[in-house]
């Protein structure tokens, strides 16, 4: 008998969500981490959410994951980004107190049934007949399980760079994981090298706050979690300053000393989170680059200068930072650095995040080529759920790009692979009008209930809210008015004699349930939060109807399965190049096949014709 059903290696954002999701499904789960004290550490910026990323956090929360609740417990500056734009692209974000975040995550992990935590260095995986079945520790211990989830972050052969200095590390002060990299290479998985970076940490007591701008929190904080009633932490401002011509000159004069530009780093960095060296080289004509001075905690004087990630030597960092307004006398507590690490080509994965050629092994987070806490957490949840499903001999669950940003991300990764660290944006989702942050619970909590990963507290609250929403929508659709009747109450409707329901009227600009209450006093019964959801759904109703046909088409493509043993070589009409690419990537369905580089509509037609012919043949044989 196995020691556990699921083993999760790594206690970062992906690992915590994976372990929690697995345990919520009832799997006996072991979380292996170097040190229990580092569970939930925010390795880079002290913030959760943002554009696209905030959607992922809401989706994690809708499935009863941890990140939203923990962010609410630790948030010290909540802001809803893109507030003036449509609800589809608004992004909830908070700066977080690092200490509060880590403590809240550790409390969550400690409170979960079926979840044990072990300290140590997992350096190898156990296999039997090509199936992963456990983990081997550096100290000689071993643990067996039906499924293993790797969430190693930047630890796989991690190498820190500060100028020409190199230090093997997963992050500052922690040893890298070398053994697991060798294990994955031994399995024949295609590995690559990526890079990310972080800025220096500053002593806030030595910043001249009078010389920098201020950015405050929203007056009414919007929580991440459906389960959060109110934000209780004191909310704070962050500072805003800019680089100067003097800053740019120092960096340009020393660019050859940067680890990135000296040829020392082979890994590719994130395009959308460039280092200050990249900004100067690529956007040298700008008169300055904005920097946000983000306090790392309510009782912590450390400040994170968001916008000046660097791998320059310490003396250059010290010089250029002091040319920035407000930072002339600043004390640097820790230099900025770049870190290189190994990752696996995500095209090696099934949409379950299971490794195709190594059954029993699942990967989540930066090991799959992504960047960001939110992307990692979302993958961890998916890998943890599917690892537990496999252990219970249940079918895997695949998220679709038509139902979630999680599905968009996983489809992008497993179908297209990556050329640089992958970051989520709302622009990546074709159906973003449907996949809003505000409706994540309505979209995904029913999925979580069906899977069995939603706890009783959320289940009860969700059912109550859904009942209130449905009652409110039924009421709005039962009330109607003619243009002339509406005119008496100040409603500007088309004078076409058509009756319109209250729900239809809400699709008009500047209409609200509050504004309709003089006409229909019974609308007082609709609670404020339910009214806000109904108003958004009414505004998007026409567009959602148009989008529905497109979604059905994509779902049809996703449901047209391609057998794993499909013989592309025997398919006439396909070029040799396409045969090789398709045979290598093994798309599971037509939707994935369409995303393979170079695949044409004609090639899809050939595959579809073959599938239909085989289907008819099997029916004849079966008949």
Swiss-Prot record:
Main location group: cytoplasm
Gene: mnmG
PANTHER family the UniProt entry points to: GLUCOSE INHIBITED DIVISION PROTEIN A, PROTEIN MTO1 HOMOLOG, MITOCHONDRIAL
Molecular function GO terms recorded: flavin adenine dinucleotide binding
Subunit organization: Homodimer. Heterotetramer of two MnmE and two MnmG subunits.
GO cellular component: cytosol
Species: Sinorhizobium medicae (strain WSM419) (Ensifer medicae)
Record: residues binding NAD(+): 269-283
Protein name per its UniProtKB record: tRNA uridine 5-carboxymethylaminomethyl modification enzyme MnmG
Cofactors that this protein relies on: FAD
Entry's family note: Belongs to the MnmG family.
Function summary: NAD-binding protein involved in the addition of a carboxymethylaminomethyl (cmnm) group at the wobble position (U34) of certain tRNAs, forming tRNA-cmnm(5)s(2)U34.
Entry-linked PROSITE patterns: GIDA_1, GIDA_2
Highest taxon above the source species: Bacteria
Binding site for FAD: 10-15
InterPro entries from the UniProt entry: FAD/NAD-bd_sf, GIDA_C_N, MnmG, MnmG-rel, MnmG-rel_CS, MnmG_C, MnmG_C_subdom, MnmG_C_subdom_sf
SUPFAM superfamilies: FAD/NAD(P)-binding domain
Gene Ontology biological-process entries: tRNA methylation; tRNA wobble uridine modification
Keywords, ordered alphabetically: Cytoplasm, FAD, Flavoprotein, NAD, tRNA processing
Intracellular or extracellular location(s): Cytoplasm
């Amino acid at each position: 008998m196995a020691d556990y059903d699921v083993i999760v290696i790594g206690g970062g954002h992906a690992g915590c969500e994976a372990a929690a999701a697995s345990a919520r499904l009832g799997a006996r789960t072991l979380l292996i981490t170097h040190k229990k004290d580092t569970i939930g550490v925010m390795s880079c910026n002290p913030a959760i959410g943002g554009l696209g990323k905030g959607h992922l956090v809401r989706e994690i929360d809708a499935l009863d994951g941890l990140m939203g609740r923990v962010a609410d417990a630790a948030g010290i500056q909540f802001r809803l980004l893109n507030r003036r734009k449509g609800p589809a692209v608004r992004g909830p974000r908070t700066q977080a107190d690092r200490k509060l975040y880590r403590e809240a995550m550790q409390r969550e992990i400690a409170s979960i049934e079926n979840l044990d935590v072990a300290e140590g260095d997992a350096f190898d995986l156990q296999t039997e007949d090509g199936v992963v079945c456990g983990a081997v520790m550096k100290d000689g211990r071993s643990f067996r399980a039906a499924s293993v989830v790797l969430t190693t972050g930047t630890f796989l052969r991690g190498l820190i760079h500060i100028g020409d200095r190199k230090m093997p590390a997963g992050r500052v002060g922690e040893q890298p994981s070398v053994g697991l990299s060798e294990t994955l290479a031994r399995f024949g998985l295609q590995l690559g090298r990526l890079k990310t970076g972080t800025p220096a940490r500053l002593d806030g007591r030595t910043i001249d706050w009078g010389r920098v701008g201020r950015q405050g929190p929203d007056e009414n904080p919007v929580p991440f979690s459906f389960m959060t009633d109110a934000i209780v932490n004191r909310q704070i401002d962050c500072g805003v300053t800019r680089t100067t011509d003097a800053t740019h000159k120092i960096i340009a004069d020393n660019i050859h000393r940067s680890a990135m530009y000296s040829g020392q780093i082979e890994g590719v960095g994130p395009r959308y989170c460039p280092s200050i060296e990249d900004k100067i080289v690529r956007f040298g004509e700008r008169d300055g680059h904005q920097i946000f001075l983000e306090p790392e905690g309510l009782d912590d004087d450390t400040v994170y200068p968001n916008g000046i990630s660097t791998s320059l030597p310490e003396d250059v960092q010290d010089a250029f930072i002091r040319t920035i307004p407000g930072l002339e006398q600043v004390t640097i507590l820790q230099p900025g650095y770049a870190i290189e690490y190994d990752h696996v080509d995500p095209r090696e994965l099934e949409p379950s995040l299971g490794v195709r050629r190594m059954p029993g092994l699942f990967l989540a987070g930066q090991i799959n080529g992504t960047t960001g806490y939110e992307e990692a957490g979302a993958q961890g949840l998916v890998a943890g759920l599917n690892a537990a499903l496999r252990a219970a001999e249940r079918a895997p669950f695949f998220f679709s790009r038509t139902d979630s940003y999680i599905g968009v991300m996983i489809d992008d990764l497993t179908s297209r692979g990556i050329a640089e660290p992958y970051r989520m944006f709302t622009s990546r989702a074709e159906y973003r009008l449907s996949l809003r942050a505000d409706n994540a619970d309505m979209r995904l909590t029913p999925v979580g209930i069906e899977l069995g990963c939603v706890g009783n507290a959320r289940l009860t609250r969700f059912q109550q809210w859904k009942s209130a929403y449905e009652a409110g929508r039924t009421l709005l659709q039962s009330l109607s008015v003619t243009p002339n009747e509406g005119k008496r109450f100040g409603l500007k409707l088309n004078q076409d004699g058509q009756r319109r329901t209250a729900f239809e009227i809400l699709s008009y600009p500047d209409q609200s349930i509050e504004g309709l209450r003089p006409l229909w006093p019974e609308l007082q019964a609709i609670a404020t939060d339910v009214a806000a959801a109904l108003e958004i759904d009414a505004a998007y109703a026409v567009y959602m109807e148009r989008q529905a046909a497109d979604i059905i088409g994509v779902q049809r493509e996703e449901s047209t399965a391609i057998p794993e043993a499909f013989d592309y070589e025997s398919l006439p009409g396909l070029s040799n190049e396409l045969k090789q690419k398709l045979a290598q990537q093994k798309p599971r369905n037509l939707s994935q096949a369409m995303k393979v580089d170079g695949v044409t509509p004609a090639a899809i037609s050939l595959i579809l014709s073959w599938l239909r012919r085989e289907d008819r043949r099997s029916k004849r044989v079966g008949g």
